[in-house]
Amino acid sequence: MDFPERIYTKEEVKLARELIEQGYKHDLQIDGSSEFIVKVGKAFDLIATAGYCDFVQTYIKTIKEISGLSQLREEDAAIWFHLKALDDPVDDAGFIIQKTQQMKDFIEGNLYYETAEIKAVNKRKEFVETLKNKTTDPEIKKKCEENLKRWSEQPFP
């Protein structure tokens, strides 16, 4: 059975959930300029280092370059990313993990907006902590520490 082209109706969400429960993984596509593909590739290398590739490939089909605001497009299982937003591979990878968590919540029928953002941010922080512990690159460790510090200084209500 093929993964639904769009994930919009109850039936499409149900089919997506069933396929994921059976172990379905997307062949992640990165669509954009060569500079965009390189920058997303660097972020994805960090996702691989932390061991989160399966998580992303379970819920995200495409990471696409756009000229508007970076965001999750649930109905397309896609992350839309503006090239200018890609300036720090650790932060970029964290954004991908955060949006993947939101997609997971959407498919599972959990609240994925409003206060659920806290859950997605916590997943992002978990990822950065894991990356910090798994990487051997001192510069990446430093960026992880800076990233975690920045996120700990942003209290949620």
Where are the model-predicted features located?
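Auxiliary, metal-adjacent structural segments of Zn-dependent hydrolase domains
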Residues: D2, E12-K84
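Stable alpha-helical elements in mature extracytoplasmic
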Residues: K39-A43, D92, A116
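Post-HExxH zinc-binding segment in Zn-dependent metallohydrolases
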Residues: E108-N147
